[in-house]
Amino acid sequence: MREVISIHIGQAGIQVGNACWELYCLEHGIQPDGQMPSDKTIGGGDDAFNTFFSETGAGKHVPRCIFLDLEPTVVDEVRTGTYRQLFHPEQLISGKEDAANNFARGHYTIGKEIVDLALDRIRKLADNCTGLQGFLVFNAVGGGTGSGLGSLLLERLSVDYGKKSKLGFTVYPSPQVSTAVVEPYNSVLSTHSLLEHTDVAVMLDNEAIYDICRRSLDIERPTYTNLNRLIAQVISSLTASLRFDGALNVDITEFQTNLVPYPRIHFMLSSYAPIISAEKAYHEQLSVAEITNAAFEPASMMVKCDPLHGKYMACCLMYRGDVVPKDVNASVATIKTKRTIQFVDWCPTGFKCGINYQPPTVVPGVDLAKVQRAVCMISNSTAIGEIFSRLDHKFDLMYAKRAFVHWYVGEGMEEGEFSEAREDLAALEKDFEEVGAESAEGAGEGEGEEY
């Protein structure tokens, strides 16, 4: 088996995790107490879902995951929520005091007390696997726990499980909507270790997903639950091929191979289509070509970033539901002819497609319509660079005055770490510029003229 362990860190990670496991359980017909009624074995007795669930002798299905937070309230919601019987109590780890939006508290003082316990639990989960293929890490980089403890845990995972791939689903601070003043600090410090210790990081931001909810689902005042359920659909589509059988299945390591041209450039845009409310879906026939086009719309992106400002380096399309390879090939051919969607000239093909026959499931009572087919796109575009330049700019404004820095230094950080992380991101911005620049020969000539 190719198992995957999910790690949910901090409030954002845990709440996204709740939405994901809720959806997985629905997709596999697993009840909130972990039982799977035998008449409803969805894969016809096939055990592909064991990549995400382990089965006990009593026939209970336990998620291969761990929830980790430095303060108890969010984890307590899981402990008392609908799915409290699904998780093993040891999988829910919470500390006593908060990271207080402070990267240094999450990474140095409070985080290091809990990280060994977490690694111990992860070790138990890993021993329970026959062929662990990697980790999915869910966190946000604006707060203290997700950024500080998140990067600490990733660093430790690199030491303990060097060869296993790590996929991050990371909520980045939005351009306009902010939940903390020190977000730019936390994000820059955290991205510094994401660069080093994740293989692929899918970027999400709340503002972009709010806009999608308002625009496509007609929700006037979206809540975090609405956002998380949308994110869960994306993650479910990505992992569907690990959990079901299909015509073109995609492994976790395949993502890396196809999406990451250079190790540092592994920050991805994601989008999902069709996002459509139940009332509208009744009147629309969503063909493969239509949903493929929708996935490339700038408005479908799950992070505030306009792909028209950059070029695509690679792109992964994961279809699910009633889709055949012929339709996919036709849609991709159409996309290639569009002038607006530009690829870098050193990457001529640029598309990786996956097809899975399990149609998308929706959580009952939720705003998304039940559709026959859906597509999730993960793409590597040079436009992602603008997210980092936006962050860096905010970081610089604060750091020039050394505002709020004493909170970090007081928790045992050194000021040098700020400048080190900032330089690393400056280098990343430069990497994005160079990758998007004209072709290989052009670069060579330019250098010749300069010297």
Swiss-Prot record:
One Pfam family linked to the record: Tubulin_C
Keyword Glycoprotein listed: no
Processing and modification events after translation: Undergoes a tyrosination/detyrosination cycle, the cyclic removal and re-addition of a C-terminal tyrosine residue by the enzymes tubulin tyrosine carboxypeptidase (TTCP) and tubulin tyrosine ligase (TTL), respectively.
Membrane-crossing segments per the record: none
Major subcellular site: cytoplasm
Name listed for the protein in its UniProt record: Tubulin alpha-2 chain
Catalytic residues (UniProt): E254
GO molecular function terms noted in the UniProt entry: GTP binding; hydrolase activity; metal ion binding; structural constituent of cytoskeleton
Subunit structure of this chain's protein: Dimer of alpha and beta chains. A typical microtubule is a hollow water-filled tube with an outer diameter of 25 nm and an inner diameter of 15 nM. Alpha-beta heterodimers associate head-to-tail to form protofilaments running lengthwise along the microtubule wall with the beta-tubulin subunit facing the microtubule plus end conferring a structural polarity. Microtubules usually have 13 protofilaments but different protofilament numbers can be found in some organisms and specialized cells.
Job of this protein: Tubulin is the major constituent of microtubules, a cylinder consisting of laterally associated linear protofilaments composed of alpha- and beta-tubulin heterodimers. Microtubules grow by the addition of GTP-tubulin dimers to the microtubule end, where a stabilizing cap forms. Below the cap, tubulin dimers are in GDP-bound state, owing to GTPase activity of alpha-tubulin.
Taxonomic source organism: Chlamydomonas reinhardtii (Chlamydomonas smithii)
Binding-site residues for Mg(2+), renumbered to this chain: E71
